[in-house]
């Protein structure tokens, strides 16, 4: 038994000090370390100050908080894996404690999958906003918080059934390596999330196309200024969620496909157990997304803001001539007198 353990320790040493593996650990730790302050800055500088409706804003805040928590957990997990080898006294010190692995591993992969649930919430909220465009801005913030709860609960239930009988008896040197008894079912769940988000992305594109036709139809009719403005707000916020959804799907899809390919191709393709284990331990796509999304968020919001101002000045404008101009003048005058009367009383 001791010989088997020592063999595993020696294998762990060879994997840990493999050049590709060491670089990937350092890369993921570094990217995550930059992503954490970047996400915090983005949330306080842009996200909390968004002009979007409270329902969508709640979903976006919950989404970015889950990404932030994932980045924090990656900092700990990959920081541990990168720095611990500098202080080991024997090869067996590289083997992660069973209890520590259990809690860190499940937390990391739970936070990997949780953000993938929120794009579905974006679509539901956006369709609701379009269907109730004329009065949506006056509706209280309710559907957003409800969706956050109902999107997280299924992930919790799935994880409970995935890991309820897991004993974690394997030997692990990485928090990202799945136990063999759970790997197949978890990979199936990843495929499900990937297909779900591909379908959701198509739904978002359809939403924008329908919204564009809906917007043109409204502009042809004599709609109120507030309705036109609300339609424009829905258009801009929907474009932002589409950008977020597409970017996340791109990186998550790359991560999922590569991870499953490594398992499917197996040890023969990589030439040895060491090389195969190194490939399983590399995790760069989603951690990179955690940093990239900060840049994407700032740039896309800046561009959408400028387009929004242009649209407001061109399509959502107050006419001052003709019969419509006279009605607008009467409405403004009446509102001013009503305000003065309320102040007087």
From Swiss-Prot:
InterPro entries per the UniProt record, alphabetical: 7TM_GPCR_serpentine_rcpt_Srb (IPR002184)
GO cellular component terms listed in the entry, alphabetical order: dendrite; perikaryon; plasma membrane
Claim: Glycoprotein is one of the keywords in the record: yes
Residue intervals annotated with topology Cytoplasmic: 44-58, 125-142, 211-241, 302-345
Positions glycosylated per UniProt: 5, 97, 180, 275
Record keywords: Cell membrane, Cell projection, G-protein coupled receptor, Glycoprotein, Membrane, Receptor, Transducer, Transmembrane, Transmembrane helix
Distribution of this protein across tissues and organs: Expressed in the head sensory neurons ASI, ASK and AWB. Not expressed in male somatic gonads or sperm.
Family, similarity comment: Belongs to the nematode receptor-like protein srb family.
PANTHER family xrefs: SERPENTINE RECEPTOR CLASS BETA-1-RELATED-RELATED, SERPENTINE RECEPTOR CLASS BETA-13
Role played: G-protein coupled receptor that antagonizes the negative effects of the gcy-35 oxygen sensor on spermatogenesis. This leads to the maintenance of mitochondrial function in developing spermatocytes and/or spermatids prior to testis maturation during the early larval stages. Regulates the navigational capacity of sperm during hyperoxic conditions ensuring the proper targeting of sperm derived from males to the fertilization site in the uterus of hermaphrodites. May act in the same signaling pathway as the neuropeptide flp-21.
UniProt protein name: Serpentine receptor class beta-13
Species assigned in the record: Caenorhabditis elegans
């Amino acid at each position: 038994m001791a010989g088997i353990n020592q063999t595993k320790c020696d294998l762990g040493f060879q994997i840990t000090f493999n050049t590709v593996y060491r670089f990937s650990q350092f890369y993921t730790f570094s990217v995550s370390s930059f992503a954490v302050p970047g996400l915090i800055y983005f949330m306080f500088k842009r996200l909390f100050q968004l002009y979007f409706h409270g329902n969508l804003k709640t979903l976006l805040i919950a989404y970015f908080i889950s990404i932030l928590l994932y980045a924090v957990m990656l900092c700990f997990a990959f920081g541990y894996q990168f720095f611990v080898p500098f202080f080991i006294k024997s090869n067996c010190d590289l083997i992660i404690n069973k209890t520590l692995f259990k809690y860190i591993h499940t937390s990391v992969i739970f936070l990997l999958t949780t953000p993938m649930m929120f794009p579905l919430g974006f679509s539901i909220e956006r369709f609701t906003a379009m269907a109730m465009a004329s009065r949506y801005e006056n509706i209280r913030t309710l559907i957003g918080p409800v969706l956050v709860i109902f999107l997280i609960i299924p992930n919790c239930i799935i994880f409970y059934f995935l890991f309820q009988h897991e004993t974690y008896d394997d030997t692990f040197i990485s928090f990202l390596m799945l136990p063999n008894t759970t790997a197949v079912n978890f990979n199936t769940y990843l495929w499900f999330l990937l297909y779900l988000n591909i379908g959701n992305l198509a739904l978002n594109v359809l939403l924008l196309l329908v919204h564009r036709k809906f917007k043109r139809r409204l502009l042809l009719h004599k709609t109120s200024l507030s309705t036109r403005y609300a339609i424009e707000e829905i258009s801009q916020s929907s474009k932002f969620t589409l950008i977020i959804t597409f970017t996340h799907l791109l990186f998550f899809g790359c991560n999922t496909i590569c991870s499953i390919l490594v398992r499917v191709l197996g040890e023969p393709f990589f030439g040895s157990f060491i090389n195969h284990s190194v490939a399983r331990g590399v995790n760069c796509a989603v951690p990179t997304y955690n940093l990239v999304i900060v840049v994407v968020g700032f740039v896309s919001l800046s561009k959408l803001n400028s387009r929004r101002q242009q649209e407001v000045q061109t399509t959502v404008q107050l006419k001052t001539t003709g019969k419509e101009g006279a009605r607008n003048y009467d409405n403004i005058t009446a509102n001013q007198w009503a305000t003065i009367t309320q102040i007087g009383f």
